[in-house]
Amino acid sequence: MEVNHVELVMSAVDPAQYPTTGYPEIALVGRSNVGKSSLTNVLINRNSYARTSSQPGKTQTLNFYNVEDQLYFVDVPGYGYAKVSKTEREKWGQMIETYLTQRDQLRGVISLVDARHAPTEDDIQMYRWLAYYELPTLIVATKSDKIARGKWNQAVSQIKKSLELPNTDNIVMFSAPKKMGKDAVWNWIEAQAFGGE
């Protein structure tokens, strides 16, 4: 998709605040600091539209980005950040669950994991939860440029084993600085958002 116009239209905490335009939505989930904002910026051809932060736990709302008046990217609060209080984590969890299970416009979820490490327990729980609710999910392994290309197969195998992924499921190796994996992610987004049209 050619992207020239992007707008952050809403930061929501409950369904009453969600946009009402009816465009298909793609949610981005992952633990704090895994690179959701960096992925968003690469996908929309901006350097710093979605704010990247070295401070985990920064996103505390569902941020709806209108892309070309055709779809929304929904940046979901990062999970697994220890310094956030238990009450705060539970509140985020409820907000995220409400959105992911009740939003009719949701067409798919991009679940981000760090290519350099085995998926965390939080990553595994999130993937199982998405699978339980039968939400179409693409696994994107971020920060792939930080590991030698010769070790990619090993990284993919580790992710598939930890998440118990079927062999048919693809994992996109992604690097924000090199914009590597961008086309593969967009192909999946377009198939999910507009495939039935």
Swiss-Prot record:
Pfam families membership: MMR_HSR1
Names of the cofactor(s): Mg(2+)
Molecular function per GO: GTP binding; metal ion binding
Ligand binding (Mg(2+)): S37, T59
Protein keywords: Cell cycle, Cell division, GTP-binding, Magnesium, Metal-binding, Nucleotide-binding, Septation
A single GO BP: division septum assembly
GO CC field: cytosol
Annotated EngB-type G domain residues: 22-195
InterPro entries to which the protein is assigned, alphabetical: G_ENGB_dom (IPR030393), GTP-bd (IPR006073), GTP-bd_ribosome_bio_YsxC (IPR019987), P-loop_NTPase (IPR027417), Small_GTP-bd (IPR005225)
Binding sites annotated in the UniProt record for GTP: 30-37, 57-61, 75-78, 142-145, 174-176
UniProt family annotation: Belongs to the TRAFAC class TrmE-Era-EngA-EngB-Septin-like GTPase superfamily. EngB GTPase family.
Described purpose of this protein according to its UniProt entry: Necessary for normal cell division and for the maintenance of normal septation.
Entry-linked HAMAP family: GTPase_EngB
Protein name as annotated: Probable GTP-binding protein EngB
Native species: Levilactobacillus brevis (strain ATCC 367 / BCRC 12310 / CIP 105137 / JCM 1170 / LMG 11437 / NCIMB 947 / NCTC 947) (Lactobacillus brevis)
GN (gene name): engB
